[in-house]
Swiss-Prot record:
The gene is Tbccd1. GO terms for cellular component: cytoplasm; spindle pole centrosome. Belongs to the TBCC family. This is TBCC domain-containing protein 1. The lineage of its organism: Eukaryota, Metazoa, Chordata, Craniata, Vertebrata. PROSITE patterns: C_CAP_COFACTOR_C.
C-alpha cells in the first residue's frame, strides 16, 4: 500500500448496473475501441469530444463498428442512466418523450443527448467483464498472477459472489489486469505510437484521470469521506508518487500506473465486505423443518448512502415484506429464495434476483437496473428503468419501464404483462427515482442473447388471463390506484370479468333459494374457493401473512414491516 495512507478501490456500481450480463460484440474489443478513441479526438468540432452526442455515436457504432442501431442506443442509454441527474431532470426527459408521436420525433430528441466521451470509452471496455474466457472455463481458477491482483475469495464467499457483476474480487482483478489498456484508451493520440501503444514518456491529461474516476475512488488514512480518484491524484503530497506536473498539467503514465497498482485494494463497501462484516438483519423468520436459515445483511451502518448494499439468501416458504430506510437507494441482491412472497416496498437503486424459484417479488421503483438470472417460475412486479433476464424458465414480469426489456441468452417461456398493482407510497417513490408512467415499453422486448431475433422465447400475457394484484399491506401515502392505468385490452378484460360476476350474483339472488339451500350453496362455494386457493398457491401466501410470534420481536424500530397483513412502524 502507498505510504501516504491513500486507499483506492474499484467502484461497484459501474459493474453491477453498467456491464451487461452478456458477452460483448467482437467490435467492442480493445483494438476497435482504440480506433474509436483516436477518431473522436480528431472530431471535436463534430460533437464527438469531450462530449459524445448520440448522432456521432450512432454514426461510429453503426457505420464503423457495424453494430445494430438498437444495440448502439442500448449502450448509450445504459451509460446515460449511470450519469448524475436529478429525478426532476429524468422526469422532464420522460415528459419530452411522451409528447413525441412518431419515431422520428423521438430520434430528434435523442439527438440532443450527450455523454462524457472518455468515460463512455471506459464503460464500453468494461463490457469485456462477461467475455467468455476459454482459459477460465478449462482451469476454473486463475493462472499465477501479478502480486497486485486480489486474493481469490474463500469457498463460502465464492459461492455467494459467483456473479461477476457483483463480485468485487472480479472488479479489482479486471481493472488490475487491464489497467494498461484502460490508461491507453485515455491517452491523447500524440502520446501513442502508430500501433496505438503507449511509451515510457507518455503523458496523461487531467481530463483523462478525471474520466478514470468513473471506475476508481478512494480515501485518505481511513477517513470516512470517499473521494473520486482525480481529487486524490491532484493532492499535493501525492504528486511525486503519481507523476503529476504542475507545469504541464499532466501525469506521467508510467508513474501513475505504478501508483494506482500500489494503492488499489478491495472495495470496503463491496459484496465481500458486506458478507464478512455487514450488519445481520432479522427480517425473515425461522421456518420449521428448513435445512438452512435465511441470511440477510447490509452495510448501511458503515457505507455512505450511495454505496449501500443489501443481500438476502435462502428466504424460503414465507412472506417477507419491508419498507425500510435501509433499502432506500440500495443495490439489492436476492439469492436462492424459494417458495416465498417477497415485498421490498422502498425506492431501490438496483435489484438482482438470482437462482430463485417458485416465488413472487413485488418491488418498489428500481432507479437503474432490475436483472434476473437462473430463476424458475417467478412472478416479478416492478416499476424499473431497465429489465434484463438471462437463463430463466417460466418467469412472468408485470413491469412498467421507459426502456425495452432485454432478453439475454438462455431463457425459456418469458411472459410480459402490464404493471398491475399499487401501494400508498408508490407514486412518491417513483418521483424520488425519476420514473414516470410514460413512455412504457413493457410489451416491446429486445432479444439480445443466443436466441438472436427469435421472438418465440417470449409472449405477452393474454388479457383473458390477466388479474389485478392486490398488495395486502397498509401504510401511509396517497396512491390509491395503478399509476398510469391499464392498457385498453386488459382493462376491457377486467370489465368483462366483473360483468360476469355481477350477472352470476344477480342469478343467485333471483333464484329464491330456501335458507337450507343457501347454506348448502355457501358451503359448496367455500369448498371450491378453498380448492382454488390450494391449487394456485394463494393459500400459502395467506397463511404466511400472519407471522409467528417470534418474528414480531425481531423488528427494527425505525423499519416498516408486516404484521397480520398490515405494514406497521
Amino acid at each position: 500500500m502507498d505510504q501516504s495512507g491513500v486507499l483506492l478501490w474499484v467502484k461497484a456500481e459501474p459493474f453491477i448496473v453498467g456491464a451487461l450480463q452478456e458477452p460483448p460484440p467482437s467490435k467492442l474489443s480493445l483494438h476497435y475501441l482504440k480506433k474509436v478513441a483516436a477518431y473522436v479526438r480528431t472530431r471535436a468540432t463534430e460533437r464527438a469530444y469531450p462530449r459524445l452526442y448520440w448522432p456521432t455515436w450512432r454514426h461510429i457504432a453503426c457505420g464503423k463498428l457495424q453494430l445494430a442501431k438498437d444495440l448502439a442506443w442500448l449502450y448509450f442509454e445504459i451509460f446515460d442512466n449511470l450519469s448524475e441527474r436529478t429525478p426532476e431532470e429524468r422526469l422532464e426527459w420522460s415528459e419530452i418523450l411522451s409528447n413525441c408521436t412518431t419515431k422520428d420525433e423521438v430520434e430528434k430528441q435523442r439527438n440532443q443527448l450527450s455523454v462524457d466521451t472518455l468515460q463512455f470509452l471506459l464503460f464500453l471496455y468494461i463490457q469485456q467483464l462477461n467475455k467468455i474466457s476459454l482459459r477460465t472455463s478449462f482451469i476454473g481458477e486463475e493462472w499465477p498472477s501479478p502480486r497486485n491482483r486480489p486474493k481469490s475469495p474463500s469457498p463460502a464467499e465464492r459461492s455467494s459472489c459467483h456473479n461477476k457483476n457483483w463480485n468485487d474480487y472480479n472488479h479489482q482483478a479486471f481493472v488490475c489486469d487491464h489497467l494498461s489498456e484502460l490508461l491507453e484508451l485515455l491517452l491523447d493520440p500524440e502520446q501513442l505510437t502508430e500501433s496505438f501503444h503507449s511509451t515510457q514518456s507518455s503523458l496523461l491529461s487531467r481530463e483523462a484521470v478525471t474520466a478514470l474516476s468513473f471506475l476508481i475512488e478512494g480515501t485518505v488514512s481511513r477517513t470516512k469521506k470517499v473521494y473520486p480518484l482525480h481529487e486524490l491524484a491532484l493532492w499535493q503530497p501525492l504528486h511525486a508518487a503519481n507523476g503529476f506536473s504542475k507545469i504541464s498539467k499532466t501525469f506521467s503514465l508510467y508513474k501513475l500506473e505504478a501508483w494506482l497498482r500500489a494503492c488499489l485494494t478491495t472495495n470496503p463497501f463491496g459484496l465481500s465486505a458486506c458478507l464478512q462484516s455487514g450488519k445481520k438483519l432479522a427480517w425473515a423468520h425461522k421456518v420449521e423443518g428448513a435445512t438452512k436459515r435465511a441470511k440477510i445483511a447490509c452495510n448501511a451502518h458503515m457505507a455512505p448512502r450511495s454505496h449501500r448494499i443489501v443481500v438476502m439468501s435462502q428466504v424460503c416458504n414465507q412472506t417477507l415484506a419491508k419498507s425500510s430506510e435501509t433499502l432506500v437507494g440500495a443495490h439489492v441482491r436476492a439469492h436462492r429464495c424459494n417458495e416465498s412472497f417477497i415485498y421490498l416496498l422502498s425506492p431501490l437503486r438496483s435489484m438482482t434476483i438470482e437462482k430463485c424459484r417458485n416465488s413472487t417479488f413485488v418491488l418498489g421503483p428500481v432507479e437503474t437496473a432490475l436483472h434476473l438470472h437462473g430463476c424458475e417460475n417467478l412472478k416479478v412486479i416492478a416499476v424499473c428503468h431497465r429489465l434484463s433476464v438471462s437463463s430463466t424458465i417460466g418467469c412472468t414480469f408485470h413491469i412498467m419501464t421507459p426502456s425495452r426489456p432485454l432478453i439475454l441468452s438462455g431463457n425459456q417461456t418469458v411472459t410480459f404483462a402490464p404493471f398491475h398493482t399499487h401501494y400508498p407510497m408508490l407514486e412518491d417513490h417513483m418521483a424520488r427515482t425519476g420514473l414516470a408512467t410514460v413512455p412504457n415499453y413493457w410489451d416491446d422486448p429486445m432479444v439480445l442473447g443466443g436466441e438472436g431475433t427469435d421472438t418465440r422465447v417470449f409472449q405477452l400475457l393474454p388479457p383473458s388471463e390477466f388479474y389485478v394484484f392486490v398488495t395486502p399491506f397498509e401504510m401511509e401515502g396517497d396512491t390509491a390506484e395503478i399509476p398510469g392505468g391499464l392498457p385498453p385490452a386488459y382493462q376491457k378484460a377486467l370489465a368483462h370479468r366483473e360483468q360476469r360476476i355481477h350477472n352470476w350474483q344477480k342469478t343467485v339472488k333471483e333464484a329464491r333459494l330456501t335458507k337450507e339451500q343457501r347454506k348448502q350453496f355457501q358451503v359448496l362455494v367455500e369448498n371450491k374457493f378453498y380448492e382454488w386457493l390450494v391449487s394456485t398457491g394463494h393459500r400459502q401466501q395467506l397463511d404466511s401473512l400472519v407471522p409467528p410470534p417470534a418474528a414480531s420481536n425481531q423488528v427494527a424500530k425505525k423499519d416498516l414491516t408486516w404484521s397480520h397483513g398490515a405494514l406497521e412502524t
